[in-house]
Amino acid sequence: MKPVIALVGRPNVGKSTLFNRLTRSRDALVADMPGLTRDRHYGEGRVGERPFIAIDTGGFEPVAKEGIVAEMAKQTRQAVVEADVVIFIVDGRLGLAPQDRVIADYLRKTGRRILLAVNKAEGMKYTAVATDFYELGLGDPRAISSAHGDGVRELVDEALDLAFAERPELAEAAEGHDHGTRIAIVGRPNVGKSTLVNALIGEERVIAFDMPGTTRDAIYVDFERNGKPYTLIDTAGLRKRGKVFEAIEKFSVVKTLQSIADANVVVLLLDAQQDISDQDAHIAGFIVESGRALVIGVNKWDGLDGHARDRIKHDMERKLQFLSFANVHYISAKQRTGIGALMKSVDDAYAAAMVKLPTPKLTRVLQEAVEFQQPRRAGVSRPKLRYAHQGGSNPPIVVIHGNALSNIPETYRRFLEGRFRDAFQLKGTPLRIEFRTNKNPYAQSNE
Protein backbone atom coordinates (compact mmCIF):
# COMPACT_ATOMS: atom_id res chain seq x y z
CA MET A 1 0.00 0.00 0.00
CA LYS A 2 1.07 3.55 -0.64
CA PRO A 3 1.09 6.27 2.03
CA VAL A 4 -1.42 9.08 1.52
CA ILE A 5 -0.37 12.72 1.96
CA ALA A 6 -3.01 15.47 2.06
CA LEU A 7 -2.12 19.10 1.26
CA VAL A 8 -4.22 21.50 3.32
CA GLY A 9 -4.30 25.27 3.72
CA ARG A 10 -6.27 28.41 3.07
CA PRO A 11 -6.77 29.59 -0.52
CA ASN A 12 -3.80 30.66 -2.66
CA VAL A 13 -0.97 29.45 -0.45
CA GLY A 14 0.48 27.23 -3.19
CA LYS A 15 -1.12 23.83 -2.54
CA SER A 16 -1.76 23.07 -6.20
CA THR A 17 1.75 24.16 -7.19
CA LEU A 18 3.19 21.72 -4.65
CA PHE A 19 0.77 19.00 -5.79
CA ASN A 20 1.85 19.44 -9.41
CA ARG A 21 5.50 19.29 -8.44
CA LEU A 22 4.96 16.09 -6.44
CA THR A 23 2.92 14.24 -9.04
CA ARG A 24 5.10 15.38 -11.95
CA SER A 25 7.96 13.30 -10.51
CA ARG A 26 6.53 10.35 -12.44
CA ASP A 27 3.67 9.74 -14.89
CA ALA A 28 1.03 11.23 -12.64
CA LEU A 29 -2.41 9.74 -12.31
CA VAL A 30 -4.38 12.88 -11.64
CA ALA A 31 -8.05 12.53 -10.89
CA ASP A 32 -10.43 15.43 -11.18
CA MET A 33 -13.41 13.26 -10.49
CA PRO A 34 -16.83 14.47 -11.64
CA GLY A 35 -19.45 13.49 -9.12
CA LEU A 36 -17.01 13.74 -6.24
CA THR A 37 -15.79 17.32 -6.37
CA ARG A 38 -13.85 19.67 -8.56
CA ASP A 39 -11.87 20.71 -5.49
CA ARG A 40 -10.22 17.46 -4.37
CA HIS A 41 -7.57 16.03 -6.69
CA TYR A 42 -5.64 12.79 -6.38
CA GLY A 43 -2.29 11.98 -7.92
CA GLU A 44 0.57 9.55 -7.59
CA GLY A 45 4.12 10.64 -6.89
CA ARG A 46 7.43 9.07 -6.04
CA VAL A 47 10.46 10.14 -4.05
CA GLY A 48 13.36 7.81 -4.69
CA GLU A 49 12.00 4.29 -4.38
CA ARG A 50 9.01 5.34 -2.29
CA PRO A 51 5.69 5.89 -4.09
CA PHE A 52 2.81 7.75 -2.47
CA ILE A 53 -0.61 9.23 -3.17
CA ALA A 54 -1.07 13.00 -2.84
CA ILE A 55 -4.39 14.77 -2.31
CA ASP A 56 -4.78 18.41 -3.30
CA THR A 57 -7.66 20.22 -1.62
CA GLY A 58 -9.50 23.45 -2.23
CA GLY A 59 -8.90 26.42 0.02
CA PHE A 60 -9.94 25.37 3.53
CA GLU A 61 -12.29 27.55 5.55
CA PRO A 62 -13.43 25.20 8.33
CA VAL A 63 -16.01 27.56 9.81
CA ALA A 64 -17.95 27.97 6.54
CA LYS A 65 -21.56 26.79 6.86
CA GLU A 66 -23.00 27.04 3.35
CA GLY A 67 -22.25 27.47 -0.34
CA ILE A 68 -19.22 26.38 -2.31
CA VAL A 69 -16.83 27.38 0.49
CA ALA A 70 -18.61 24.98 2.86
CA GLU A 71 -18.41 22.24 0.24
CA MET A 72 -14.67 22.85 -0.12
CA ALA A 73 -14.29 22.59 3.65
CA LYS A 74 -16.20 19.29 3.60
CA GLN A 75 -13.92 17.93 0.89
CA THR A 76 -10.83 18.98 2.83
CA ARG A 77 -12.07 17.22 5.96
CA GLN A 78 -12.57 14.06 3.89
CA ALA A 79 -9.02 14.34 2.54
CA VAL A 80 -7.70 14.58 6.11
CA VAL A 81 -9.64 11.43 7.04
CA GLU A 82 -8.06 9.57 4.11
CA ALA A 83 -4.52 10.78 4.80
CA ASP A 84 -1.69 9.23 6.75
CA VAL A 85 0.10 12.59 7.00
CA VAL A 86 -1.22 16.12 6.49
CA ILE A 87 1.03 18.89 5.16
CA PHE A 88 -0.42 22.19 6.36
CA ILE A 89 0.75 24.92 3.97
CA VAL A 90 0.96 28.59 4.93
CA ASP A 91 2.19 31.66 3.05
CA GLY A 92 5.60 32.91 4.21
CA ARG A 93 5.34 36.19 2.32
CA LEU A 94 1.97 37.22 3.72
CA GLY A 95 2.70 35.90 7.20
CA LEU A 96 0.34 34.39 9.74
CA ALA A 97 -3.35 34.94 8.99
CA PRO A 98 -6.30 34.49 11.38
CA GLN A 99 -7.57 31.70 9.15
CA ASP A 100 -4.30 29.81 9.65
CA ARG A 101 -5.01 29.70 13.39
CA VAL A 102 -8.50 28.30 12.81
CA ILE A 103 -7.16 25.59 10.49
CA ALA A 104 -4.38 24.71 12.94
CA ASP A 105 -6.94 24.35 15.75
CA TYR A 106 -8.97 21.97 13.59
CA LEU A 107 -5.97 19.88 12.52
CA ARG A 108 -4.70 19.43 16.07
CA LYS A 109 -8.01 17.75 16.97
CA THR A 110 -7.87 15.22 14.13
CA GLY A 111 -5.12 13.07 15.59
CA ARG A 112 -3.29 13.04 12.25
CA ARG A 113 0.44 13.58 11.88
CA ILE A 114 0.85 17.22 10.79
CA LEU A 115 3.81 18.87 9.09
CA LEU A 116 3.79 22.68 8.87
CA ALA A 117 5.23 23.97 5.57
CA VAL A 118 5.90 27.68 5.05
CA ASN A 119 5.67 28.19 1.30
CA LYS A 120 7.03 31.02 -0.87
CA ALA A 121 10.06 31.21 1.41
CA GLU A 122 12.68 31.54 -1.32
CA GLY A 123 15.17 34.32 -0.59
CA MET A 124 13.98 34.71 3.02
CA LYS A 125 15.96 34.00 6.19
CA TYR A 126 14.63 31.02 8.13
CA THR A 127 14.19 33.00 11.34
CA ALA A 128 12.00 35.51 9.53
CA VAL A 129 9.98 32.70 7.97
CA ALA A 130 9.53 30.62 11.09
CA THR A 131 8.96 33.14 13.87
CA ASP A 132 5.34 33.97 13.00
CA PHE A 133 4.26 30.36 12.66
CA TYR A 134 5.66 28.80 15.83
CA GLU A 135 2.61 30.02 17.71
CA LEU A 136 0.42 27.59 15.73
CA GLY A 137 1.74 24.83 18.00
CA LEU A 138 2.46 22.38 15.18
CA GLY A 139 6.18 22.00 15.71
CA ASP A 140 9.02 23.43 13.66
CA PRO A 141 7.92 25.19 10.45
CA ARG A 142 9.59 23.84 7.29
CA ALA A 143 10.56 26.53 4.78
CA ILE A 144 9.84 25.50 1.18
CA SER A 145 9.25 26.89 -2.28
CA SER A 146 6.64 24.96 -4.25
CA ALA A 147 7.48 26.97 -7.35
CA HIS A 148 11.24 26.34 -7.28
CA GLY A 149 11.40 23.07 -5.35
CA ASP A 150 13.45 24.35 -2.41
CA GLY A 151 12.97 22.09 0.62
CA VAL A 152 10.30 19.96 -1.07
CA ARG A 153 12.28 16.70 -1.18
CA GLU A 154 13.15 16.97 2.50
CA LEU A 155 9.52 17.75 3.38
CA VAL A 156 8.14 14.73 1.54
CA ASP A 157 10.85 12.43 2.91
CA GLU A 158 9.85 13.50 6.41
CA ALA A 159 6.16 12.95 5.64
CA LEU A 160 6.85 9.43 4.35
CA ASP A 161 9.03 8.61 7.36
CA LEU A 162 6.13 9.62 9.61
CA ALA A 163 3.63 7.60 7.60
CA PHE A 164 5.67 4.39 7.76
CA ALA A 165 6.45 4.89 11.45
CA GLU A 166 2.76 5.41 12.22
CA ARG A 167 1.53 2.48 10.12
CA PRO A 168 4.17 -0.21 9.51
CA GLU A 169 1.54 -2.25 7.68
CA LEU A 170 1.91 0.15 4.75
CA ALA A 171 5.14 -1.64 3.92
CA GLU A 172 3.85 -5.05 4.89
CA ALA A 173 0.28 -4.99 3.58
CA ALA A 174 0.93 -6.79 0.35
CA GLU A 175 3.31 -9.34 1.88
CA GLY A 176 1.79 -12.76 2.43
CA HIS A 177 -0.81 -12.19 -0.27
CA ASP A 178 0.74 -14.19 -3.07
CA HIS A 179 -2.05 -16.74 -2.78
CA GLY A 180 -2.73 -16.37 -6.49
CA THR A 181 -3.56 -13.85 -9.19
CA ARG A 182 -4.45 -10.57 -7.48
CA ILE A 183 -7.70 -9.10 -8.82
CA ALA A 184 -9.13 -5.63 -8.17
CA ILE A 185 -12.78 -5.03 -9.04
CA VAL A 186 -13.23 -1.30 -9.56
CA GLY A 187 -16.00 0.98 -10.71
CA ARG A 188 -18.17 3.84 -9.61
CA PRO A 189 -20.82 3.34 -6.91
CA ASN A 190 -23.78 1.05 -7.46
CA VAL A 191 -22.51 -0.76 -10.56
CA GLY A 192 -22.69 -4.08 -8.71
CA LYS A 193 -19.14 -4.56 -7.41
CA SER A 194 -20.34 -6.11 -4.16
CA THR A 195 -22.68 -8.49 -5.99
CA LEU A 196 -19.85 -9.64 -8.24
CA VAL A 197 -17.57 -10.07 -5.22
CA ASN A 198 -20.14 -12.32 -3.55
CA ALA A 199 -20.65 -14.27 -6.77
CA LEU A 200 -16.91 -14.92 -6.99
CA ILE A 201 -16.05 -15.79 -3.40
CA GLY A 202 -19.22 -17.10 -1.75
CA GLU A 203 -19.71 -15.97 1.85
CA GLU A 204 -18.97 -19.32 3.48
CA ARG A 205 -15.68 -20.23 1.76
CA VAL A 206 -13.94 -16.88 2.09
CA ILE A 207 -10.71 -16.51 4.04
CA ALA A 208 -10.09 -12.82 4.69
CA PHE A 209 -7.60 -10.62 6.40
CA ASP A 210 -9.17 -7.40 7.62
CA MET A 211 -6.56 -4.88 8.69
CA PRO A 212 -7.65 -2.58 11.50
CA GLY A 213 -8.09 1.05 10.65
CA THR A 214 -10.17 3.22 8.42
CA THR A 215 -11.68 3.14 4.95
CA ARG A 216 -8.26 3.73 3.41
CA ASP A 217 -7.12 0.23 4.41
CA ALA A 218 -7.25 -2.50 1.78
CA ILE A 219 -8.71 -5.93 2.45
CA TYR A 220 -7.27 -9.03 0.79
CA VAL A 221 -9.61 -11.99 0.28
CA ASP A 222 -8.16 -15.35 -0.76
CA PHE A 223 -10.45 -17.67 -2.71
CA GLU A 224 -10.34 -20.49 -5.22
CA ARG A 225 -12.30 -20.97 -8.41
CA ASN A 226 -12.10 -24.16 -10.47
CA GLY A 227 -9.04 -25.17 -8.49
CA LYS A 228 -7.14 -21.94 -9.21
CA PRO A 229 -6.06 -19.61 -6.37
CA TYR A 230 -6.85 -15.89 -6.46
CA THR A 231 -6.60 -12.94 -4.12
CA LEU A 232 -9.31 -10.31 -4.32
CA ILE A 233 -8.29 -6.78 -3.38
CA ASP A 234 -11.44 -5.19 -2.05
CA THR A 235 -12.72 -1.87 -3.34
CA ALA A 236 -16.40 -2.50 -2.59
CA GLY A 237 -15.93 -2.06 1.14
CA LEU A 238 -16.05 -5.63 2.46
CA ARG A 239 -16.39 -5.72 6.22
CA LYS A 240 -16.66 -8.81 8.35
CA ARG A 241 -19.82 -9.11 10.44
CA GLY A 242 -19.71 -12.30 12.47
CA LYS A 243 -19.08 -15.09 9.97
CA VAL A 244 -20.75 -13.27 7.13
CA PHE A 245 -19.21 -10.69 4.83
CA GLU A 246 -21.29 -7.69 4.02
CA ALA A 247 -20.35 -5.70 0.93
CA ILE A 248 -20.88 -1.98 1.23
CA GLU A 249 -20.91 0.06 -1.97
CA LYS A 250 -18.64 2.97 -1.19
CA PHE A 251 -16.42 4.74 -3.68
CA SER A 252 -13.00 5.90 -2.57
CA VAL A 253 -10.41 7.29 -4.95
CA VAL A 254 -7.61 6.34 -2.57
CA LYS A 255 -8.80 2.75 -2.28
CA THR A 256 -9.27 2.51 -6.03
CA LEU A 257 -5.73 3.76 -6.72
CA GLN A 258 -4.30 1.45 -4.05
CA SER A 259 -6.17 -1.54 -5.40
CA ILE A 260 -5.16 -0.90 -9.02
CA ALA A 261 -1.51 -0.56 -7.95
CA ASP A 262 -1.61 -3.83 -5.96
CA ALA A 263 -3.47 -5.87 -8.58
CA ASN A 264 -2.21 -8.17 -11.32
CA VAL A 265 -5.50 -7.79 -13.20
CA VAL A 266 -8.19 -5.12 -12.86
CA VAL A 267 -11.85 -5.81 -13.60
CA LEU A 268 -13.54 -2.54 -14.57
CA LEU A 269 -17.24 -2.95 -13.87
CA LEU A 270 -19.75 -0.81 -15.78
CA ASP A 271 -23.53 -0.48 -15.41
CA ALA A 272 -25.34 -1.53 -18.59
CA GLN A 273 -28.40 0.43 -17.53
CA GLN A 274 -26.57 3.77 -17.49
CA ASP A 275 -24.51 5.72 -20.00
CA ILE A 276 -20.73 5.62 -19.70
CA SER A 277 -19.88 8.50 -17.36
CA ASP A 278 -16.84 10.74 -17.09
CA GLN A 279 -16.13 8.96 -13.82
CA ASP A 280 -16.02 5.60 -15.64
CA ALA A 281 -13.56 7.09 -18.14
CA HIS A 282 -11.38 8.53 -15.36
CA ILE A 283 -11.17 5.18 -13.59
CA ALA A 284 -10.31 3.54 -16.92
CA GLY A 285 -7.57 6.14 -17.38
CA PHE A 286 -6.08 5.21 -14.00
CA ILE A 287 -5.89 1.58 -15.07
CA VAL A 288 -4.24 2.28 -18.42
CA GLU A 289 -1.67 4.68 -16.96
CA SER A 290 -0.80 2.14 -14.26
CA GLY A 291 -0.09 -0.48 -16.93
CA ARG A 292 -2.32 -3.10 -15.35
CA ALA A 293 -3.96 -5.94 -17.25
CA LEU A 294 -7.66 -5.24 -17.73
CA VAL A 295 -10.97 -7.02 -18.24
CA ILE A 296 -14.21 -5.06 -18.69
CA GLY A 297 -17.45 -6.35 -17.20
CA VAL A 298 -20.74 -4.76 -18.28
CA ASN A 299 -23.14 -5.68 -15.48
CA LYS A 300 -26.97 -5.85 -15.33
CA TRP A 301 -27.05 -7.01 -18.96
CA ASP A 302 -29.95 -9.40 -18.36
CA GLY A 303 -32.50 -6.62 -17.94
CA LEU A 304 -31.93 -4.89 -21.29
CA ASP A 305 -33.72 -5.15 -24.63
CA GLY A 306 -31.91 -5.17 -27.97
CA HIS A 307 -32.10 -1.41 -28.47
CA ALA A 308 -30.63 -0.68 -25.03
CA ARG A 309 -27.84 -3.18 -25.60
CA ASP A 310 -26.90 -1.56 -28.91
CA ARG A 311 -26.91 1.86 -27.21
CA ILE A 312 -24.46 0.87 -24.47
CA LYS A 313 -22.15 -0.85 -26.98
CA HIS A 314 -22.08 2.29 -29.11
CA ASP A 315 -21.45 4.44 -26.00
CA MET A 316 -18.48 2.25 -25.04
CA GLU A 317 -16.99 2.41 -28.53
CA ARG A 318 -17.23 6.19 -28.44
CA LYS A 319 -16.01 6.92 -24.90
CA LEU A 320 -13.73 3.98 -24.08
CA GLN A 321 -12.02 3.38 -27.41
CA PHE A 322 -8.63 3.59 -25.66
CA LEU A 323 -9.52 0.27 -23.95
CA SER A 324 -9.73 -1.68 -27.20
CA PHE A 325 -7.00 -4.05 -25.97
CA ALA A 326 -9.30 -5.44 -23.25
CA ASN A 327 -11.90 -8.21 -23.50
CA VAL A 328 -15.47 -7.10 -22.78
CA HIS A 329 -17.99 -9.38 -21.05
CA TYR A 330 -21.70 -8.71 -20.72
CA ILE A 331 -22.72 -10.24 -17.42
CA SER A 332 -25.28 -10.39 -14.66
CA ALA A 333 -23.58 -10.60 -11.28
CA LYS A 334 -26.97 -11.08 -9.63
CA GLN A 335 -27.92 -14.02 -11.87
CA ARG A 336 -24.28 -15.18 -11.97
CA THR A 337 -24.25 -15.37 -15.76
CA GLY A 338 -21.15 -14.67 -17.83
CA ILE A 339 -18.82 -14.83 -14.84
CA GLY A 340 -16.99 -17.97 -15.95
CA ALA A 341 -16.01 -16.37 -19.26
CA LEU A 342 -14.98 -13.18 -17.46
CA MET A 343 -12.66 -15.14 -15.16
CA LYS A 344 -11.10 -16.92 -18.14
CA SER A 345 -10.29 -13.49 -19.56
CA VAL A 346 -8.74 -12.58 -16.19
CA ASP A 347 -6.42 -15.58 -16.52
CA ASP A 348 -5.64 -14.77 -20.16
CA ALA A 349 -4.95 -11.10 -19.39
CA TYR A 350 -2.52 -11.99 -16.60
CA ALA A 351 -0.73 -14.46 -18.87
CA ALA A 352 -0.44 -11.77 -21.56
CA ALA A 353 0.91 -9.24 -19.06
CA MET A 354 3.66 -11.64 -17.95
CA VAL A 355 4.52 -13.05 -21.39
CA LYS A 356 8.14 -13.54 -22.45
CA LEU A 357 8.89 -12.01 -25.85
CA PRO A 358 11.94 -13.56 -27.57
CA THR A 359 14.24 -11.03 -29.22
CA PRO A 360 14.52 -12.93 -32.55
CA LYS A 361 10.75 -13.07 -32.99
CA LEU A 362 10.30 -9.44 -31.90
CA THR A 363 12.90 -8.33 -34.43
CA ARG A 364 11.33 -10.46 -37.16
CA VAL A 365 7.87 -8.99 -36.49
CA LEU A 366 9.39 -5.49 -36.54
CA GLN A 367 11.14 -6.09 -39.86
CA GLU A 368 7.98 -7.52 -41.42
CA ALA A 369 6.03 -4.48 -40.22
CA VAL A 370 8.58 -2.08 -41.73
CA GLU A 371 8.51 -3.98 -45.03
CA PHE A 372 4.73 -3.71 -45.06
CA GLN A 373 4.70 0.00 -44.16
CA GLN A 374 7.71 2.23 -43.58
CA PRO A 375 7.51 5.21 -41.21
CA ARG A 376 7.20 8.63 -42.84
CA ARG A 377 10.34 10.64 -43.45
CA ALA A 378 10.99 13.19 -40.70
CA GLY A 379 13.12 16.11 -41.93
CA VAL A 380 16.14 15.02 -43.94
CA SER A 381 16.16 11.36 -42.92
CA ARG A 382 13.69 8.53 -42.71
CA PRO A 383 13.59 6.67 -39.37
CA LYS A 384 15.38 3.32 -39.49
CA LEU A 385 14.07 0.65 -37.13
CA ARG A 386 16.82 -1.92 -36.60
CA TYR A 387 15.88 -4.46 -33.94
CA ALA A 388 13.63 -4.96 -30.92
CA HIS A 389 13.83 -6.65 -27.54
CA GLN A 390 11.67 -6.91 -24.43
CA GLY A 391 12.26 -4.20 -21.86
CA GLY A 392 9.92 -5.39 -19.12
CA SER A 393 6.68 -7.12 -18.26
CA ASN A 394 3.41 -6.31 -16.49
CA PRO A 395 2.87 -4.52 -18.81
CA PRO A 396 5.05 -5.87 -21.61
CA ILE A 397 7.49 -3.28 -22.95
CA VAL A 398 8.99 -3.54 -26.43
CA VAL A 399 12.17 -1.52 -26.92
CA ILE A 400 12.94 -0.66 -30.55
CA HIS A 401 16.45 0.49 -31.51
CA GLY A 402 17.42 2.40 -34.61
CA ASN A 403 18.24 5.81 -36.06
CA ALA A 404 16.22 9.04 -36.32
CA LEU A 405 13.49 7.66 -34.05
CA SER A 406 12.66 10.86 -32.19
CA ASN A 407 9.91 11.86 -34.61
CA ILE A 408 8.06 8.57 -35.02
CA PRO A 409 4.38 9.62 -35.28
CA GLU A 410 1.78 8.24 -32.89
CA THR A 411 -0.10 6.63 -35.77
CA TYR A 412 2.95 4.53 -36.64
CA ARG A 413 3.48 3.57 -33.01
CA ARG A 414 -0.11 2.29 -32.92
CA PHE A 415 0.49 0.40 -36.17
CA LEU A 416 3.50 -1.35 -34.63
CA GLU A 417 1.55 -2.07 -31.46
CA GLY A 418 -1.11 -3.82 -33.52
CA ARG A 419 1.49 -5.96 -35.30
CA PHE A 420 3.10 -7.03 -32.02
CA ARG A 421 -0.30 -7.74 -30.44
CA ASP A 422 -1.34 -9.94 -33.36
CA ALA A 423 1.97 -11.81 -33.45
CA PHE A 424 2.02 -12.59 -29.72
CA GLN A 425 -1.76 -12.68 -29.09
CA LEU A 426 -1.53 -9.96 -26.44
CA LYS A 427 -5.14 -9.48 -25.35
CA GLY A 428 -6.02 -7.85 -22.06
CA THR A 429 -2.77 -6.06 -21.30
CA PRO A 430 -1.43 -2.63 -22.21
CA LEU A 431 1.63 -2.80 -24.46
CA ARG A 432 4.26 -0.09 -24.23
CA ILE A 433 6.68 0.69 -27.04
CA GLU A 434 9.89 2.64 -26.44
CA PHE A 435 12.14 3.99 -29.19
CA ARG A 436 15.87 4.29 -28.55
CA THR A 437 18.47 5.81 -30.81
CA ASN A 438 21.81 4.33 -29.82
CA LYS A 439 24.61 2.10 -30.99
CA ASN A 440 23.60 -1.41 -31.96
CA PRO A 441 25.24 -4.41 -33.64
CA TYR A 442 23.85 -3.50 -37.05
CA ALA A 443 24.85 0.16 -37.09
CA GLN A 444 28.06 0.01 -39.17
CA SER A 445 27.04 -2.71 -41.60
CA ASN A 446 23.73 -1.08 -42.51
CA GLU A 447 24.77 2.54 -42.75
UniProtKB/Swiss-Prot annotation:
Domain KH-like: 355-439
Record-listed GTP 2 binding positions: 187-194, 234-238, 299-302
Residues of the EngA-type G domain: 3-167, 181-354
Database matches in PROSITE patterns: G_ENGA (PS51712)
Function, in words: GTPase that plays an essential role in the late steps of ribosome biogenesis.
Keywords from the named record: GTP-binding, Nucleotide-binding, Repeat, Ribosome biogenesis
Protein name, UniProt field: GTPase Der
Subunit structure and binding partners: Associates with the 50S ribosomal subunit.
Binding site for GTP 1: 9-16, 56-60, 119-122
Family recorded in the similarity comment: Belongs to the TRAFAC class TrmE-Era-EngA-EngB-Septin-like GTPase superfamily. EngA (Der) GTPase family.
Organism: Ralstonia nicotianae (strain ATCC BAA-1114 / GMI1000)
GO biological process, one term: ribosome biogenesis
Coiled coil ranges: none
InterPro entries for the chain: AAA+_ATPase (IPR003593), G_ENGA (IPR031166), GTP-bd (IPR006073), GTPase_Der (IPR016484), KH_dom-like (IPR032859), KH_dom-like_a/b (IPR015946), P-loop_NTPase (IPR027417), Small_GTP-bd (IPR005225)
Source organism, top-level taxon: Bacteria
Gene Ontology MF annotations: ATP hydrolysis activity; GTP binding; ribosome binding
HAMAP family named in the record: GTPase_Der
